[in-house]
A protein has these predicted regions:
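PP2C/PPM-type serine/threonine phosphatase catalytic domain
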Residues: 1-168, 172
Length: 177
């Protein structure tokens, strides 16, 4: 059995921000969001560079291992371009982006995630979050120092511990059905 998809991508600046630092992609087999880090120079550039570099991984794969390898390879390549851009434009130092994407292979989904852009699985009448935020506050929850309810209003809830900036640490989850 294959997974059938319908997709679209849209983004809205909202009422608070002055610029939109999001990039997204809704393709045939690959769907992702890259959310540029607000408050840092070049969040919009970081998300666009990652999105342009990673979108090329949208193709049919024989298996989920090949899909995961291709996505991670594309992310690492795009991350190198991001680092090169910072080297050539020092004013962009500190720019980064989150990345959360799924690629469909037959009846399986491969998920790659870094940062705090969430992925949810929707089936029948259930919605389940399948990613865990890579934030300072999530780490506090994980270690039992604060409750999930306290995390919702914590003043540092948006402080990322991992992003596409200077890292090759990717949480690549495979075989999600």
């Amino acid at each position: 059995m294959s997974i059938k998809t319908q997709s679209f991508a849209a983004s809205n600046i909202g009422r608070v921000r002055k610029s939109n630092q999001d990039s997204g992609y809704a393709g045939y087999n690959f769907f992702f969001v890259a959310d540029g880090m607000g408050g840092h120079a070049g969040g919009d550039i970081a998300s666009a560079l990652i999105a342009q570099g990673v979108a090329k991984a949208d193709r049919v794969y024989d298996n989920t291992d090949a899909a995961a390898e291709s996505v991670v390879e594309a992310l690492l390549e795009a991350n190198s371009k991001l680092a090169e851009t910072v080297e050539n434009h020092p004013e962009l130092k500190g720019m980064g982006t989150t990345f959360s994407g799924i690629i469909v292979t037959g009846d399986l989904v491969t998920l790659t995630h870094i940062g705090d852009s969430r992925v949810f699985m929707v089936s029948d009448d259930q919605v389940k979050q399948v990613t865990k935020d890579h934030t300072f506050v999530q780490r506090l929850v994980d270690t039992g120092r604060i409750t999930p309810a306290e995390a919702l209003v914590h003043p540092r809830r948006s402080v990322l511990m991992r992003s596409e900036e200077h890292t090759s640490e990717l949480q690549s989850l495979r075989h999600i059905s």
